[in-house]
């Protein structure tokens, strides 16, 4: 969702008043993640989809949440609701992507990037550098959090979002 929202903002900047991006840096994915996704696509196309594995779930979570059954079961339920066809569509449409950061950097709108300190899919250094060099861009790093920010730190995320929205209104 974050990459698509960023792409929309770049394509139609006149329609966007602000941008909030959770657990996403709108740039290329790490090579390792691209390889993993391509393997998943091949496997699902060849053998069908039987659901997300615990090992894959753990790659999205901070180590402190590896045994949090509430979060793990929630991820499994979301995965089950969407199924293999939606997974394939998502992976095929979001794996190979261009770097949108230079375009976003030129937009003159308030932006907030929120990410976990142990999120393996977000290039945190790039977001932090952008926030240092562009006053429109704010970033919020969440401790003890991986890629599943809304599940791992829901209250702190709600507070950060509320603060960002309130600051835009005042």
Where are each of the predicted segments found?
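Short beta-strand/loop motif that positions the catalytic acidic residue
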Residues: 107, 113-115, 119
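Glycosyltransferase donor-binding loop in the core domain
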Residues: 44, 79, 119, 146-149
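Flexible "cap/lid" loop of the alpha/beta hydrolase fold
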Residues: 6-54
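Gly/Ala-rich beta-loop-alpha elbow adjacent to hydrolase catalytic centers
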Residues: 1, 5
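Active-site-adjacent alpha-helix of alpha/beta-hydrolase-fold enzymes
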Residues: 128-137
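Conserved alpha/beta-hydrolase catalytic His-Asp/Glu region
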Residues: 29-32, 47-106
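Conserved alpha/beta-hydrolase "acid-adjacent" motif
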Residues: 120-126
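Catalytic active-site module of serine/aspartate enzymes centered on a nucleophile-bearing elbow/loop
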Residues: 137-170
